[in-house]
Amino acid sequence: MKVNDMFWFWLILGIIALFIIVKAIVIVNQYEGGLIFRLGRVIGKLKPGINIIIPFLDVPVKVDMRTRVTDIPPQEMITKDNAVVKVDAVVYYRVIDVEKAILEVEDYEYAIINLAQTTLRAIIGSMELDEVLNKREYINSKLLEILDRETDAWGVRIEKVEVKEIDPPEDIKNAMAQQMKAERLKRAAILEAEGEKPE
């Protein structure tokens, strides 16, 4: 072999070796967890720091274990007394069991959103409009209780649920605005009358 050929041989061999070494190293952050799959089977867990795997045979799957926030998109729901309200919420959750989160559900965030929507629809459907507008804390606690129980099988803990907005029908909004205006006018008249009283 010529010197030039030897140079290219060792260069290509070095590049291949470097590529394999880079592929063999998996860095996991402190806030992550994960599993190592070899030919489709779980063979171990990823730990924070540097993990060594066999390239092309092992597949690392990482999961963020910090608290995450996801919006539940606004949707129209029907109350027990057939009023239509638009409700949206936000869910705070975190993965507590990496193995369940990876193996038991395909996409836990998507599953949480769908579960929250159907659960919220059921809760709102069991209440009358007046209750829905006045019992936001009850709705939050009921939704949290049900979601946390159901997502336990996925290795997810629901930490907090907040209903952001409950938007009543237009006719109800108009009636509420008129009532508030009437109350302001009444207070103003009382204050004005008290100001005119002789001492």
UniProtKB/Swiss-Prot annotation:
Keyword Zinc-finger: no
Organism superkingdom: Archaea
Transmembrane segments: 7-27
Keyword check for Disulfide bond: no
Subcellular location: Membrane
Topology of this chain in the membrane: Single-pass membrane protein
InterPro entries according to UniProt: Band-7_stomatin-like (IPR043202), Band_7 (IPR001107), Band_7/SPFH_dom_sf (IPR036013), Band_7/stomatin-like_CS (IPR018080), Stomatin_HflK_fam (IPR001972)
Keywords: Membrane, Transmembrane, Transmembrane helix
Main location: membrane
Cellular component GO terms, alphabetical: plasma membrane
Family named by the database record: Belongs to the band 7/mec-2 family.
Protein name: Uncharacterized protein MJ0827
Upper taxonomic lineage: Archaea, Methanobacteriati, Methanobacteriota, Methanomada group, Methanococci
